[in-house]
A protein has these predicted regions:
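Conserved Rossmann-fold dehydrogenase catalytic segment
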Residues: 133-142, 163-175, 194-200, 245-248, ...
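Short, well-structured beta-strand/strand-turn elements
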Residues: 25-26, 281-295, 395-398, 674-689, ...
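Terminal low-complexity tails and localization/encapsulation signals of metabolic enzymes
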Residues: 1-3, 194, 209, 292-374, ...
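Substrate-binding/catalytic subdomain of NAD(P)-dependent oxidoreductase enzymes
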Residues: 158-196, 276, 292-293, 552-594
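Extended, hydrophobic interaction surfaces within ordered domains
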Residues: 20, 139-140, 147-161, 168-169, ...
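Aromatic-enriched alpha-helical interface/lid elements that frame and gate functional surfaces
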Residues: 204-283, 287, 602-676, 680
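A short glycine-threonine-serine/GTX helix/turn-capping micro-motif
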Residues: 135-146, 199, 203-205, 214-217, ...
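N-terminal helix-loop segment corresponding to the beta1-alpha1 unit
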Residues: 1-161, 274, 311, 344-561, ...
Length: 765
């Protein structure tokens, strides 16, 4: 069991919650009266603190030598000195994880931060919202949670290396590494993606109004899905000219998707939401009801899979969102209780920290020696295996021209200045598949399935994101795999999970966002929600799959046992809804907030000089507002001197701030406000992230690598820096089947004659 001391309020509470979900013993370090969040945000505190204990700083100092990890979110705050003392007391064998909003180097290293400003700094805001409105923050402090998630991953990576190192996690880099197409579109095409409201710019999906609600859906992303959509329209007599030959071209469909949307709207508007959801799924289309938080508690799939947890709060028992993944041998406490302040005292004879015999000298990555079989495609799964590869694992990606990864071949995802039929030049594929090897194996053949099974026997971990049941039909299910390697770990990450009434339902990221409550809560107050259209839900699922694999490896190190981790992307998204489920359980009506915040004002995104330039500004306290008002020359108004007054008159206040920012460059606004201790940051887009952001440049975030087919281009780097096992972006993404002969020779001992026979039989295609 990993023992963690958690201190500070920047993203550490989120990281601590994720580690609690994987069986860690987490103790919050706080003053006698408790951390401020207990008083200012008791529901949010309960959500993040359940399952943890609490200790005074002096007791924590005595506990430190027995702890494995110091989880430090004090960056620039009043407890920073205490955190440093804890790290010193823990000694050289512990892992000190430092969460830094903008990294620990460069001009922004000491800047003030909130979730809003870090989301702006990392490029998240630029991708969300309607094109004629300001960039929009998603619900649930997603930038903070991404930093916490990367800290949790880095914690298990460092622990696997035997502890004894310092880790720095950049919140900005955590966001910048999670943008799907946000920056790589600029890197590979020179274009900057625009905000497209509720419509994904690469996949033809959007939101539709039904007779009684909203639903996410569209044309689908494959020929099969297009045929199913067309058949649906034909069955309803509203197909128009969609049977014409030109509509068979997927690029044409993407360009003219609004025509199809208009025809679909004719069906959707007359039907009830849930009827549409289930009929679309019956046609194997990734349509999804837009659910509100209060509906989630009765969600048949989440209930059947036991997702929700009971939490004992100071006000009594409550139902909350569960954890993103369940790993055997790494379970959270059976009783999730919100701790009383400083209840943890030092045992009379505290057990010393176990010294990990696997501790190693400095090396490239903590996962060197671990081999992963990658049976994933598109984004969520490849992101998981990319994370493992970045930290040194040998990742073998099985591909086939008979089931091509759409991000290699689809024009919508290709992102390249070159021939869009070339599978080796796709910027999308090449970004999330670096550091991997590629072998082409046709799993539609018995010989191909046998080869995959033989490869799995040489692997520690298998990661797959097929729909439920597909792996079993390929004769590669967990029960079959563990017969060839008893201690193998299989991480499945289907949309809905392998059990439950929706196990066979198909999903895209927008469907997961809709079903998890994200979509309903991301928008402007009083308006139809916009949702999160880019693949953030996919990337969060990928992070959690990597985290689950690391936890399962730690269990295997301890017990010798492998296991099957049955993840659900619906659950990973719902786990990131923040405290909304807990609030709904308490009877609160949870609504979209837009860019506003219940405990800060101003808290928004304001226009700046130049077309499409914006700055995020937040005042956390009355003192910060006073400094903002002085710098901006805002007129004195007694209503604005308190948070209550500012919230009651927020629109007028925002108008005054916008009048000041509109004539000034975003960089200048951010610099003068940060010089006065007020959180602010320009809203970065793909171009400004890559070309102009000094904090990411100081982090050395974008890494150039030469690709034999695509040339030299930048890759998104690592959000975490580890002193002893840093991980790296080492090799470009493989060409299709680049390592086939090498792997068949080195792992399976097949000679050239045997390989030639397999090729002749279509097995290696």
């Amino acid at each position: 069991v990993i023992r963690v001391l958690e201190i500070g309020d920047y993203a550490a509470p989120d990281a601590g919650r994720m580690l609690v979900g994987l069986g860690a013993e987490v103790t919050i370090v706080e003053p006698p009266e408790g951390v401020a969040a207990r008083r200012t945000d008791p529901v949010g505190f309960a959500h993040r603190a359940a399952g943890k204990s609490s200790a005074l700083p002096e007791d924590a100092l005595a506990l430190a030598p027995q702890c494995d990890v110091i989880l430090d979110g004090t960056w620039g705050g009043p407890l920073a000195r205490v955190a440093a003392d804890l790290a010193e007391a823990a000694g050289d064998g512990a892992v000190h994880v430092v969460l830094a909003p903008y990294g620990d180097a460069g001009p922004a290293a000491g800047w003030a931060a909130t979730d809003l400003t870090v989301a702006a700094a990392g490029g998240m805001l630029a991708l969300i919202g309607r094109p004629d409105r300001p960039p929009l923050r998603p619900y649930g402090d997603q930038a903070d949670q991404l930093a916490g998630l990367n800290a949790a991953i880095a914690t298990l990576v460092a622990a696997r290396a035997g502890g004894g190192q310092r880790v720095v996690v950049s919140g900005q880099a955590s966001v910048a590494a999670s943008l799907e197409f946000g920056a790589i579109t600029y890197i590979h095409t020179g274009r900057v993606p625009e905000r497209t409201g509720s419509t994904h710019p690469m996949a033809p999906h959007t939101l539709f109004t039904t007779a009684d609600g909203l639903i996410a859906g569209g044309l689908g992303g494959s020929p099969r899905m297009w045929d199913a959509t067309l058949a649906w329209l034909v069955d309803n007599g509203t197909a128009g000219d969609l049977a014409d030959e030109r509509w068979q071209d997927p690029a044409y469909r993407v360009r003219h998707r609004q025509e199809v949307f208009d025809l679909l709207a004719g069906i959707v508007g007359e039907m009830k939401r849930d009827q549409l959801f289930h009929e679309g799924q019956a046609r194997r289309l990734p349509w999804a009801a837009v659910l509100r938080p209060e509906e989630l508690a009765g969600n048949a799939q989440l209930v059947d899979r036991g997702f929700f947890v009971d939490v004992m709060t100071p006000e009594g028992p409550a139902r909350d969102a569960g954890f993103a993944a369940r790993v055997g041998g790494a379970a959270p406490p059976a009783r999730l209780r919100v701790p009383e302040p400083c209840e943890h005292t030092v045992p009379a004879a505290a057990e010393p920290r176990a010294r990990n015999a696997a501790a190693t000298p400095r090396r490239r990555g903590a996962l060197e020696g671990i081999r992963v079989l990658d049976l994933t495609w598109v984004l969520a799964g490849p992101y998981a295996t990319k994370t493992l590869a970045d930290h040194g694992a040998e990742v073998i990606k099985i591909e086939s021209r008979h089931r091509p990864d759409p991000t290699r071949f689809s024009p919508g995802f290709h992102l390249s200045r070159s021939d869009e039929t070339d599978p080796d030049t796709s910027g999308y594929f090449n970004n999330v598949n670096r550091n991997k090897k590629s072998i082409t194996v046709n799993l539609r053949t018995q010989e191909g399935r046998d080869l995959a099974l033989r490869l799995a026997a040489h692997c520690d971990v298998v990661v797959e994101n097929f729909a439920a049941g597909v792996l079993d039909r390929l004769e590669l299910g967990y029960d079959r795999l563990r017969r060839v390697r008893e201690d193998i770990i299989v991480v499945s990450m289907s949309g809905m999970g392998h059990t439950g009434p929706w196990r066979d339902y198909v999903s895209y990221a927008d469907a997961v966002s809709a079903l998890s409550g994200w979509t309903a809560l991301t928008g402007e107050p009083g308006e139809q929600p916009v949702g999160v259209v880019y693949g953030l839900a996919d990337i969060i699922a990928g992070h959690h799959a990597a985290l689950a694999a690391l936890a399962a490896l730690a269990v295997r190190d301890r017990t010798g046992a492998g296991q099957h981790v049955d993840m659900s992307q619906l659950e990973t998204a719902a786990a990131h809804l923040g405290d909304a489920i807990l609030r709904a359980d308490r009877g609160e009506t949870v609504e979209p907030l837009g860019n506003r915040h219940p405990r800060m004002a101003p808290h928004g995104v304001f226009p700046c000089l130049g077309d499409g330039n914006w700055v995020a500004i937040a005042a956390r306290t009355d003192e910060e507002y006073a400094r903002l008002a002085a710098v901006a020359g805002l007129p004195y108004d007694p209503r604005w001197t308190t948070l209550t007054g500012r919230k009651a008159n927020e629109s007028a206040l925002e108008d005054h701030i916008a009048a000041w920012t509109r004539s000034r460059p975003a960089e200048a606004v951010a610099e003068i406000l940060q010089g006065n201790g007020v959180p602010a940051y320009p809203v970065r887009d793909g171009r400004t992230l890559v070309e102009h952001d000094a904090a990411l440049r100081a982090w050395e975030f974008y890494v150039p690598l030469a690709h034999p087919a695509a040339g030299t281009f930048l890759h998104e780097g690592l959000p975490a820096r580890l002193t002893r096992t840093p991980g790296s972006v080492r090799t470009p993404a493989p060409r299709l089947g680049e390592h086939t002969a090498e792997l068949l020779t080195d792992l399976l001992d097949l000679d050239e004659t045997e390989q030639a026979a397999l090729r002749a039989n279509g097995v290696l295609e």
